[in-house]
């Protein structure tokens, strides 16, 4: 059929799951989840795959082994794209993102060397400002409180140096277009606009081989 958005009932499903995160609720609504939540995500990923690579949908079950919150089910559905990209749908709307959420020690060292490079670092700083001017969010996930060891605390790009990851994202609240095929246009537009950040990271840092 092709992607046609998520229904208002899919939004309500996650709203109800937030208040009744139990096996009984999940079992009673699993068929709805598969048909009206997961299947639209799979259709969206299929339509994005030609430009952004295959996607993988995360399992709906939370890992609760070391968590105080023992709620068994995720109150959202999300997927990752092979060429960089993340799509999430939940009761609060739709989110698209890309970048490196958490870098390894080796990645961080390559990243920091690129940030202090006069050409590569300045280009990245200008890019992040352009993305923010376009209404996108850019941040480092977890941030160091001070400069990383061995790097000057007064560096012109200290904000970027303090990042332990670097991601760009946009979140849209629930609106009528979310229930239509137009939701794909929002995701596609974001991924194209933010693509230079993913390309910079892939070229200057490189993905985690693991």
Regions found by a protein language model. Give the residues of each.
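Charge-dense, helix-prone N-terminal extensions
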Residues: 1-210
């Amino acid at each position: 059929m092709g992607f046609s958005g998520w229904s208002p009932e899919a939004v309500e499903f996650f709203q109800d799951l937030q208040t009744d995160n139990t096996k009984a609720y999940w079992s009673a609504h699993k068929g709805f989840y598969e048909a009206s939540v997961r299947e639209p995500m799979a259709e969206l990923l299929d339509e994005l795959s030609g430009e952004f690579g295959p996607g993988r949908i995360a399992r709906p079950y939370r890992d609760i082994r070391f968590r105080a919150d023992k709620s068994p089910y995720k109150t959202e559905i999300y997927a990752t794209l092979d060429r960089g990209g993340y799509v999430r749908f939940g009761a609060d709307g739709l989110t698209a993102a890309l970048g490196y959420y958490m870098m390894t020690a080796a990645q961080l060292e390559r990243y920091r060397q690129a940030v202090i490079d006069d050409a590569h670092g300045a280009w990245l700083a200008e890019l992040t400002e352009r993305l923010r001017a376009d209404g996108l969010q850019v941040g480092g996930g977890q941030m160091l409180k001070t400069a990383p060891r061995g790097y000057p605390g007064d560096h012109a790009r200290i904000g970027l140096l303090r990042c332990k990851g670097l991601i760009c994202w946009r979140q849209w609240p629930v609106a009528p277009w979310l229930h239509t095929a137009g939701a794909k246009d929002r995701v596609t537009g974001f991924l194209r606009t933010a693509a230079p950040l993913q390309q910079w990271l892939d070229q200057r840092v490189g993905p985690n081989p693991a």
